[in-house]
Regions:
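Substrate-binding groove/exosite segments of carbohydrate-active enzymes
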Residues: 1-117, 126-129
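Extracytoplasmic/periplasmic, Sec-exported soluble proteins
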Residues: 76, 80, 100, 137-147
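Glycan-recognition and catalytic cores of secretory/periplasmic carbohydrate-active enzymes
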Residues: 122
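Active-site substrate-binding loop specific to GH73 endo-beta-N-acetylglucosaminidase modules
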Residues: 132
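Active-site neighborhood of glycoside hydrolase catalytic domains
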Residues: 138-166
Length: 166
């Protein structure tokens, strides 16, 4: 709990000893701790607004939010970018709060349109994938495509919650 608290500086950060950046995957991996151990709703609602501000016209977002312009492109990929789906879903599950879903809905649609342009034969062949384990041999295509599926699954849920066509 103390380590998590040490990583909150108006945004969820990756670690207390090095970068202290708002890495998006680190945040969505720790969302349950943030909501169960702390009353983190306002922090995450604010950070979801940062994600909206971070999105480029083509639909991509940075792997670090806020960003000074670094971390865009195919480098971070769907595993990191899924933050815009996973955190609003967690806020809804824990608090019944749908404001983040409503605010992010157009951002999510634009992002999914962006991913469609990167798709090759139904797969997304880019992104960091399973990068933590130094001997990892999992093809990034698998992890990125799995999160692509998750994004669409959550988007269908959000469309239903908001009374929209999926």
């Amino acid at each position: 709990m103390q380590a998590y608290r040490s990583n909150l500086h108006s945004i969820p950060t990756d670690c207390p000893q090095r970068e202290k950046n708002g890495w998006t995957a680190d945040a969505h991996i720790a969302i349950d701790l943030g909501l169960l151990g702390f009353d983190g709703i306002t922090l995450y609602e604010k950070w979801m607004n940062d994600i909206i501000d971070n999105q480029r016209e083509a639909g991509e977002i940075s792997g670090i939010i806020p960003s000074s312009g670094w971390g865009y492109g195919e480098w971070p990929g769907p595993v990191w970018d899924a933050v815009m789906f996973i955190i609003p879903n967690a806020l809804y599950d824990y608090y019944g709060e749908s404001r983040s879903i409503e605010r992010l809905y157009p951002t999510m649609l634009r992002y999914l349109d962006y991913l469609k342009t990167k798709e090759k034969d139904g797969y997304l062949p880019f992104g960091l994938g399973d990068w933590v384990y130094w001997k990892a041999t999992t093809n990034n295509e698998y992890t990125s495509t799995a999160y692509y599926y998750l994004d669409y699954k959550l988007m269908a849920r959000f469309a239903s919650l908001l009374g929209k066509d999926a």
